[in-house]
Amino acid sequence: MKRVFRKVFPLRKEPTPVPSLPENIEDIRQKALKGHHLEIVQWGQVLLDSVYVPKDPASALEWFTIAAKAGFGPGHNMRGRCFQFGWGCDQDLTEAARCYEEAAKAGDEWGRYNLGILTMRGIGQPQDLPKALDLFRTAAQNGHAKSMNLYARFLEEGWVVSQDRAAALDWYRKSAEGGDYRGQHNFATALADAGKIDEALDWWRKAVVDATSDILLAMNQKLVLLGEKRDTALETRVQRRLQELGVPVPNSAAIRPA
């Protein structure tokens, strides 16, 4: 009897089933599957960190790469984020800088900002303050709030540019109005230094919602130094947020005017 040999193929791994998603998230996924560049990046961001699906940074990077290969700036920017922080890949700061460079060339302001940060600090490439200034200035002029804040800092300090504190204040204001908590804190600080305490407090109240620990600590110090004009309710909010972040709250009595 003739024996029949059958070629055995390995079983293909079944794709991980996608849980039931809210309508807006499912719409993003479907558009991503159809090749829409914006939704490709958005779906990658869902996979990167979302309550709707299990975190899958490696798959997120694959989606960002698809968008980047299509020349889509936000795709390059998110690839840069992955390489900068080691999301779904080994950390590679040089590659992160290259991705941000591509994002900036494609006109993505977040990519321009992120490249500016690395360039300013000499991360993944040699430090180049004139280049960083140019990146922040361009992104600021194009409406990027975080870049407005850093462009203002260059102007305030006179870093590789003529010092212009009036222009710096104007850019801090624009950054604050654009919703950047660092810009809001810096603008509030300038207002307080000019004696415009009520206006300053209004901006600090906005900043406290999203501020990171470094800004919260600086804000707490400024609030304590207001003395009789201080807003104790706002101080309490700032200190509560620091506690939530696991940051020790400085003793107010230890904070003294410089």
Feature-to-residue mapping (PLM):
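Boundary/linker segments of alpha-helical solenoid repeat arrays
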Residues: 73-74, 107-111, 143-147, 176-184, ...
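Hydrophobic face of amphipathic alpha-helices that form TPR/SEL1-like repeat modules
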Residues: 42-49, 78-85, 112-121, 150-157, ...
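Terminal, low-structured helical/coil segments at or just beyond the last alpha-helical repeat
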Residues: 3-8, 215-258
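Short helix-capping/linker turns of helical repeat alpha-solenoids
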Residues: 34-36, 49-51, 69-73, 85-87, ...
